[in-house]
């Protein structure tokens, strides 16, 4: 949670050039993310951050698991059996222990913004 907009806001110039690992690319152009982003902006009048994106992904994982196996009473078991879900920016894959695996990005703070290191 440390690499949020709040870090840049509070850190100011002191965090310029700082590198962080993140799962959220605020400039992602995927249609699924852009639709979510616009809906979020319309509703909250600000850009979605880490919390909004991961909460959306988590809710959709639960809803998809319930839709695919409505009679199953053990949600964790269902999620582990399905394993792979489409997130807003990249897949979310659960291992046998229930740990979520996502692609990570290396970002650097440039001009007060998080930018993906190519």
What is the predicted role of each segment?
Residues 1-118:
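Extracytosolic ligand-binding ectodomains
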